[in-house]
Amino acid sequence: MIFQLHPRLEQDCIAIGRFELCRLLMMNDSQYPWFVLVPERADMREIYQLSKTDRQLLTEESSYLAENLAILYQADKMNIAAIGNMVPQLHIHHIVRYQTDKAWPAPVWGKFDAVPYTEQQIADNLTRIKKQLKNVKPVPNLEPLTLLLTNQSTKNSVK
């Protein structure tokens, strides 16, 4: 089987790039710096289904991402979760949280309608994150701005 990004992740996220194992996405919700790692392995639903090598690599990539997001966005707390109740494809959320954000201290899911980024905000975020993450590579044949949400009323429902 060939890896294919779940349609819901494609709809709700903006492609940033990829690491050795994972595709890096940014959730199109400007209320929170919210990023998603998706291991580029076909038919994966759970972390334990990955090979031992891939599990270790996922841990490294997730830790690297979380640390750099915390630094870049001066996080009060990083929320990291692999839930997958709505989107069965294995994906790991990395959400920068602040004690002053709208949903604090509750989880962000389903609390408020998403507020999509403007094209300028997307460009600014892509520049910042790519500068911070030295080893993120482009996703072949994919322009980040082509994944802008067309449905501007999407809720924070990718879980």
Positions of predicted regions on the chain:
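HIT superfamily nucleotide-processing domains
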Residues: M1-L90, H94-K159
